[in-house]
Amino acid sequence: MIGRTLTATCTIQSVSADSDEATIGQIHGQSSVFMLLIYRPANHDVQVVTYTINGGSTATRATVVTGVNLGDTITYSIHYSGSVVTTVVNGVTNTYSVDSSWAGTPVYFKLGSYHAAPNTGNPAGDATKVSFSAFSVTP
C-alpha cells in the first residue's frame, strides 16, 4: 500500500473493565503491527502508537487529542505515503516519520474494536463496544 488514507467516524460506548484502552484503527504489516490509534477512557484521550522498527517491539506513544469521553464521536484519518504517516483526529493533525525498515513492506488498514482484555473469564456484558457510522479507504 502506497499513498492510501483510512477515514472513519466512530463512537466508543464502552471499554472492557479488564482493559485500559481500545484500538480503533491501525496499519498492519503481514506479520507485525505498524501503527495503532488507541482510545484510553481513564485519560479521556486518543493516542497514536507507532512501532519504530518493522518486526520490533519498541513503540512510541503520542497523545493526539484529550477531553474525549465514552459516547463522544471520534472522527479520524490515517494517511500513509512513502516515509510519512499523517493522522487527523477530531481536527488535530500530526505527522510521523516512518523508519526505513518498513520500506516496501506490504501493509493494510484495520478498523474495529480491539482491546487487551482476556477473551475468557470476563463477567457477562464486560465488553469493548465501538460503533462506526462511516469509514472509507481512498487512494
Task: Label every PLM stretch briefly.
Residues V48-T50, T87:
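Short hydrophobic/aromatic-rich beta-strand segments that constitute the beta-sheet cores
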Residues V88-V92:
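Short strand-turn-strand beta-turns centered on an Asx-Gly dipeptide
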Residues G3-T7, A17-E21, G67, V98-P139:
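Ligand-recognition surfaces built from glycine- and aromatic
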Residues M1-V46, T138:
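Secretory/extracellular carbohydrate-interaction modules
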Residues A8, D72-Y80, V85-T87:
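Short tryptophan-centered beta-strand motifs in secreted/extracellular beta-sheet-rich domains
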Residues Q30-L36, N54-T60, T95, A116-D126:
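Short, surface-exposed beta-strand/loop "edge" segments at domain boundaries and coil↔beta transitions
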Residues T50-T75:
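Short, aromatic/His-centered strand-loop micro-motif at the edge of beta-sheets
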